[in-house]
């Protein structure tokens, strides 16, 4: 598996669920994901690209086929370039005409012609001419059209000179989506849109969208951004981001405005139904619904489009903040109540535990709130219950927890058991100085797996002024610290050495190449491109052991990626090193 193309760089900066805040760089232009691309129709602009740029939209999408087919637009684009023609300095992505192909059945351009045209007009991100098979198409049709898409992908790979989308197709057949994702992952592309879902979104078949996205994500390499083609309503953003979607596009902001429809994060309302605007954007702060209704159609459409854009932008920000706070699942739960079909999709997503758990952070900034029955099925809850089973058997002394059931009291100080809220209180008893070591040993087994407690069995535990376990030492040397915020262990270098001795390879290891070795020894962060191998069991924010190819300990630190991600990612940090051996 190649490590991707240097024309586009993508790295993860923060995460929750399978969602991630990323930094995407194309041609020296940087944006933060999740991001939304307003769709710009070059023949009919409701909002000018320059105004979109002023509003803070750093990426837009337009249709290269529409430009290609229109003689005047084609001449302008070839003469001026796409950025000057649209008067827009941000990242410009283009579609290839696939949507027109799905809508009208045929288009008058070949795959090679549209790719070469995209090169010539200077787009930042291109798209080859895939075939978007509609939902519920006969399997024979889906297979045949997918093979044509893959053939065109091979042609695009040979001639592409710019970062390019490789769209995952396959209708509603999840095995075909996985097959397409595996094949395209092995090729030299930069972004993977998931296509053919607009009819599903329009008919509120969100459950099918979940199955399609998860099937695709399971087979895609995790270092490439994923774009959910045609998903532009804020009602789906939280759910889609929780699945690992990074990019969205919206034509609906303008289409809805033309139909006098007003977007909210919970759905869409007709303008004539509104007495008040439940929003404080510049449009809604200035006008009343009555004033908008009395305006000429063109002016009203433009103002509604601006409102819709502000709502879209606000919801993307809300999703990002939820990721930062470790509250993404809570937002998904809240948004799922907006529509029964969305609620069904949310419940379906929670069935994909194996996929979700790999990316679920091991610890979070916010406490876990039981806000619904579904919150008991969140990945963080299921994982904690599974891990606690062996601790319960070995350490015993079970107490009743309102979320997790019967749990060993020696886990009662640790995330998420202590940092959680339900209808009933969970009483945390402070340990005595004598049994504090049992807490540390139980935490070690929970955090690092079977056998990890042996690294601490002769240690002494110092209590804080509040009576909580804090420093773990042997002969005055610090092995670890029990963190005050989440009750998990941060390793000192002496503790890392002991853990390295008792845990079999490759448990909790991140293996780096010779180039990175001297930097890791000195306590410098480990970047993903230097990682040769990592324990597949490593989860984001785990405490890990950094080693060389001979399994010699170099450093200890906090994983920022899952083990599988570390091996594949080309950009960004893999481990925030806390201490090197030197």
From Swiss-Prot:
An example molecular function term from Gene Ontology annotations? pentosyltransferase activity
Q: Where is the PUA domain?
A: 507-582
The EC category is transferase
Q: What is this enzyme's catalytic activity, as reactions?
A: guanosine(15) in tRNA + 7-cyano-7-deazaguanine = 7-cyano-7-carbaguanosine(15) in tRNA + guanine
- Mind naming one GO cellular-component term on file for this protein? cytoplasm
EC code(s) of this entry? 2.4.2.48
What is the active site of this protein? 95
| Cofactors demanded by this protein | Zn(2+)
What is the protein's known function? Exchanges the guanine residue with 7-cyano-7-deazaguanine (preQ0) at position 15 in the dihydrouridine loop (D-loop) of archaeal tRNAs.
Report the HAMAP family cross-referenced here.
Answer: TgtA_arch (MF_01634)
Query: Oligomeric state and partners?
Result: Homodimer.
Q: What is this protein called?
A: tRNA-guanine(15) transglycosylase
The organism of origin for this protein: Pyrococcus horikoshii (strain ATCC 700860 / DSM 12428 / JCM 9974 / NBRC 100139 / OT-3)
List the taxonomic lineage: Archaea, Methanobacteriati, Methanobacteriota, Thermococci, Thermococcales
């Amino acid at each position: 598996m190649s490590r991707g193309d240097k024309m586009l760089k993508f790295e993860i900066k923060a995460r929750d669920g399978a969602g991630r805040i990323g930094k995407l760089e194309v041609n020296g232009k940087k944006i933060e994901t999740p991001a939304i691309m307003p769709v710009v129709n070059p023949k009919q602009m409701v909002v000018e690209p320059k105004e979109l740029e002023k509003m803070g939209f750093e990426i837009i999408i337009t249709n290269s086929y529409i430009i290609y087919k229109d003689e005047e637009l084609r001449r302008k684009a070839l003469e001026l370039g796409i950025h000057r023609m649209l008067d827009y300095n941000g990242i410009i992505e283009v579609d290839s005409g696939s949507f027109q192909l799905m809508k009208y059945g045929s288009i008058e351009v070949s795959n090679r012609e549209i790719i070469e045209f995209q090169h010539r007009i200077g787009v930042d991100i291109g798209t080859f001419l895939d075939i978007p098979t509609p939902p519920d198409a006969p399997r024979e049709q889906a297979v045949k059209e997918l093979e044509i898409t893959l053939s065109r992908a091979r042609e695009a790979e040979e001639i592409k000179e710019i970062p390019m989308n490789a769209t995952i197709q396959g209708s509603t057949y999840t095995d075909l989506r996985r097959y397409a994702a595996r094949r395209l992952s092995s090729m030299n592309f930069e972004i993977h849109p998931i296509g053919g879902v607009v009819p599903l979104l329009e008919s509120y078949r969100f459950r099918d969208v979940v199955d399609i996205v998860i099937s695709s994500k399971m087979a895609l390499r995790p270092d490439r951004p994923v774009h959910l083609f045609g998903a532009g309503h804020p009602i789906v953003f939280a759910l889609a981001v929780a699945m690992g979607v990074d990019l969205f596009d919206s034509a609906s902001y303008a289409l809805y405005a033309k139909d006098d429809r007003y977007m909210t994060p919970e759905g869409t309302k007709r303008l004539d139904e509104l007495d008040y605007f439940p929003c404080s954007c510049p449009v809604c702060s200035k006008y009343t619904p009555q004033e908008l209704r009395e305006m000429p159609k063109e002016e009203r459409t433009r103002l509604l489009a601006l409102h819709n854009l502000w709502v879209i932008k606000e919801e993307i920000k809300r999703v990002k903040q939820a990721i930062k706070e470790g509250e993404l699942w809570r937002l998904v739960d809240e948004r799922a109540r907006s529509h029964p079909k969305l609620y069904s999709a949310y419940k379906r997503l929670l069935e994909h535990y194996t996929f979700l758990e790999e990316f679920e952070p091991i610890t979070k900034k916010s406490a876990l709130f039981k806000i619904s029955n579904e919150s008991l099925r969140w990945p963080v809850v299921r994982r904690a219950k599974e891990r606690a089973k062996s601790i319960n058997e070995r350490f015993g002394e079970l107490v009743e927890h309102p979320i997790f059931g019967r749990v060993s009291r020696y886990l009662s100080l640790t995330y998420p058991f202590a940092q959680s809220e339900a209808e009933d209180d969970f009483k945390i008893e402070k340990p005595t100085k004598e049994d504090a070591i049992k807490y540390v040993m139980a935490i070690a087994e929970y955090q690092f797996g079977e056998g990890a407690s042996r690294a601490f069995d002769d240690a002494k535990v110092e209590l804080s002024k509040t009576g909580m376990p804090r420093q773990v030492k042997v002969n005055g040397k610090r092995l670890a610290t029990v963190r005050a915020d989440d009750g998990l262990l941060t390793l000192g270098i002496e503790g890392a050495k002991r853990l390295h001795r008792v845990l079999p390879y490759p448990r909790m290891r991140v293996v780096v190449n010779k180039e990175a070795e001297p930097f890791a020894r000195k306590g410098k962060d480990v970047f993903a491109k230097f990682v040769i191998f990592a324990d597949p069991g490593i989860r984001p924010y785990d405490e890990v052991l950094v080693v060389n190819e001979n399994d010699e300990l170099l450093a200890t630190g906090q994983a920022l990626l899952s083990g599988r991600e570390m091996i594949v990612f080309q950009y960004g940090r893999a481990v925030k090193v806390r201490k090197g051996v030197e």
